[in-house]
Structures are given as structure tokens and as C-alpha cells.
Amino acid sequence: MTTHVGPQTTLLHQTGQISALIAGEAVQTCEASSCQMSGTPFQQWTYVTEGRYTNARTHPSDEDRRRQTTVSNPRYLAQEPPRFLLPTAQNNAPTMSQSATYSTLPVQGFPEQNRVLDNRSDPKYGPLPATTGSLAQYSIQRPSTSRNMENAGSSSSYYDAPSCSRGSVGSIGRMNDLDSQYSGSTTAFPSPVHSDSSPIYPAIAPISGYQQQLPIHQRHTTSSMPSGFENLLHHHSTSPSPPPRCASSSSRYRLFIRQQPLAARACGAGDRDRRPVDPPPIIQLLLTEFNPNSEKDRSILQDPRFTVGCLLYPVRNPSYLPGSGSGAGSSDTNTNSNDKSRHESMSSYSQLGINLEDSHATGQSTPLLSGKAFVSPFFVDEEPDPNTAPAHPSSTDDSTYDASPRTVTHRFRNRPLPKPPACFFIFSDLSVRTAGLYRLQFRLMNWGSIEDTGQSMPILAEVWSEPFRVCAAKDFPGMRDSSLLTLRLKELGFVELKTRGQGMGKGRRVGIGSSKVSSRARVE
């Protein structure tokens, strides 16, 4: 189908174009008249935000150019550090360049201040030219790879290394905020991307190889550890170590058996079966030339490093009678028994009715002694039972020393009984598994001698008990009443002792001066 346009339609079209031209001329005439009536020049429209965009239709005047470049802090801008830009793939070390004007705009995202644009391009309405100029007014002279600054495209250290003084590349407003905040401060903020020749940050970049020069215990501790903790973890004391304690002389120590074992019931093979030796052996430590008023002698008795060990030996010679051998109740004066020959040791044990070969063979199969064989000292300020207390030996009568209870009673008969301090070793948990005739050997040792001398622990003193009988269950006569010494030691704080006697059941306590003590305890 063919459409025919008549002459009327063509005339109307031409009339509309003429009307549009007349309206445009009227608008321009009104604008010109308004400008002439106001008397002030009408400034061309510009769109300026921190120097990012300007009107490219006309060149601004010199006054407008100075107004745009004026900021609130000119003193700091005079020394403003250069902006940091990533290097391009073709040039890893951009050079410092400055120019007053640019013919074209840079790529969007890297705006700069003090920029004057050319008339040939409009950043808002016109397309960018094919060739662009320099990317920025300032560019930093970056250090080379010899200064530990490697640039490899997108994996640059600019993104990896944080810095409190570096602002965002695409935001001039953030940089202006930092400039106004630290304008009056002289503190330099280190940044690993600045060159060593920067006038604002002189010699503040981390020195290469500094961590390798430090000692091993000081590396990577200054930033992650509070101050003062390095001395606690890596303490290097310059003060001399305290002098070692003086080694005690072993010639002063003596052991005395205050309470001899008399009988025991054989216990079973299990560890829970306890049949303690009756009465419990009580050993007292004596000192030669002991002075109760001497602090040194009292401190020796209070030494917690003392210990007494107990050994069990079967008696194979039934003809041996208690008291027939020397040293049945007193300590052996020869403290260097470890230096004796084997022949002398065998002869001395034979005099006591003990066969070492039989005792060693028996101990290899099943241990005969069970319980607590090593005990610690128990110190008291006053002697609990002065009637049976031995006298401390002196250096004059050391060869004929006899501290039996009968001799002690005779010594203190005609004068008031003193109550000196005393040190006891109480064996309240000793059991024997097999019936027979046995003797106990007690040895005094001090754990501190290893610390003082660094040598093996010597035996300071030793003492042998009298032979006692271990009976089977059907032959055992029963437990005896507790002695006065046992009762008073329990009253003084040694709670492991078990007391027996008339009126001494569970829940009852017998005082030291009570009249309920058995007659046997009074006689002793």
C-alpha cells in the first residue's frame, strides 16, 4: 500500500521547524537580558568536588585556579608526602614527575588535586581520547629489590604490608583527614614503602636483617609480649648462687631405741593385711655434746631431711640371747660400716645370729617386711617421758657409752628431771609375713648430704633391735597395752599411733596426766 503525502502535511512540518527556531532565539534573548540587568557576570557552570571534575568548556581564571588549590593546612601541604601508586607492568620503578597542567584526564579512580583540563574533552559528556597522559602529578621513587621491596603485579607489598600513615589510593578525602589530624604532630609514622631519602620519614624503615642479628631468644618477642616478660621467660641471673649448706659431721649422731619390738602376728600375702609389730618401734636421735640452749643444736634436730630406714633380718642362731652381743640397745659407733671388708661384715652379723646368705635368698622370693619402712623425724619441744629418756653422749665417755633405761633412771634419781627437746622416728606400720625370729636394723640417713656434697648418701648411724618373735595367728597372745611414751606422743600430734588399754576404746581420749594408764605403763 502506498501512502501519499499531500502539500498540506509538508507545509505543517516546515511551520513547526520555524516555530522551534523562534522559541530558541527567545530563550537566548531572555538569558542575555537577565545577565545585563544583574550587572554581574554569569559564571559558567562547573562541577568541582575536591578537584575531581571541572567544566572543560572554558578555561577558569587565575583567581578560580588559586581558590581551588587553596586548602586548610598549607604548612603541611608544603611537605606533603607523595601519593603512592602501583607500578605498571611495563615500568616497575616510576620516576618523580611534576607538571602544571594536563591535556587529558587520568583514568577514573586516581584523581589528583590542582588539575586543569583541556577544552578538547569533557569528562562528563565527551569520550576520553585514545591516548592519555601521565597517571598522576606525583609518583614515588620506589626502592629496588635489593631493599626487600618486591613488586610482582597484583601481589605487591603495598597491599600486604599495613601502615598507619598510608591512606587509600582512591580516596583523597581520607588523606586530607589524616593530614589535618597529624598536621601539628612531629611523630613519624613508619611505612615500608617509603624510600630512605624521604624528607618526612628519615631512616624509619625496618632495617633488613635486623631479626637475624638478634639472639634467638629475643626474636619476635618485642611486639607480641608485654614488657618485662622477657626477663621472666629468659632469666639470666647475674647474682652469685647461694652457698651450699655445710655438711654435717656424722660423728655426732647416735640412734637409741626408746621402745623395743616384742612380738608380732604374721600377716597374709596381700598388701591390705596389716598386723603391726607390737609395740611399735620408736627411735630417738641423740647428739654428742648436745646443748639444749644452742640454736644450732636445736636446728640439727629439726632438720626435715633426716630419715631412718628399717631392714628385717631373720635370726638363724637360736642360742643367741638378748644382751649377749654388744650394741643390742645402743647405736654402732663405727659409722663407716660401708668401708669394711666382706669378711668383717660376715663375722659381725654372725655374732648377732644372722646369716646374710639366708636372709638374701629369702628376700629374693617374697619380701618379708611390709608397710612403711622409711619414716621422717617427729620433733617435740619437750621430752614426753623424762623417766625413760636417755642422756645425750659426751665425747669423753664415747667408748663406754651405755644409754640403757636402767642407767638413765639412776642418773636422774637425785636431781630434777630435765625436759630437753627431742627428735623421734616412729614405725607405726611394720608387718612381717612369715613366722620366725627376727631382728630389725635401723639406719640414719640425710637426704641433704647429696645436695651438699654431690656424693652418695652415707649412713650416719645405725642400731640393732633385740630379737622378737613373729607368731602364727593361732599362737599369737594378743596386743599389749600402750606405753606412756606412746600415749604422750599421740597427744603431741602423732595421730598414726594406735593406743590400747583399759578404757581406751574408740571415741575416748586419755590425757597425759590421766589415771587410766595401765599399770605396765607406770612400771616402765
Curated annotation (Swiss-Prot):
Disruption phenotype: Leads to increased number of conidia and reduced production of cleistothecia. Increases expression of brlA, abaA, wetA and vosA genes that control sequential activation of asexual sporulation. Its main location: nucleus. GO terms for cellular component: nucleus. Keywords: Nucleus, Sporulation, Transcription, Transcription regulation. Residues 248-500 form the Velvet domain. GO terms for biological process: regulation of asexual sporulation resulting in formation of a cellular spore; regulation of sexual sporulation resulting in formation of a cellular spore; sporulation resulting in formation of a cellular spore; trehalose biosynthetic process. InterPro entries: Velvet, Velvet_dom, Velvet_dom_sf. Induction: Specifically accumulates during the early phase of sexual development. Residues 131-153, 178-195, 393-402 have a biased composition (Polar residues). The keyword Nucleus applies. It is found in: Nucleus. The keyword Nucleus applies. Residues 114-195, 322-349, 380-413, 503-524 are annotated as: Disordered. Velvet-domain-containing protein that acts as a positive regulator of sexual development. Positively regulates the production of the sexual fruiting bodies called cleistothecia. Interacts with vosA. Belongs to the velvet family. VelC subfamily. This is Sexual development regulator velC. It comes from Emericella nidulans (strain FGSC A4 / ATCC 38163 / CBS 112.46 / NRRL 194 / M139). The lineage of its organism: Eukaryota, Fungi, Dikarya, Ascomycota, Pezizomycotina. The gene is velC.
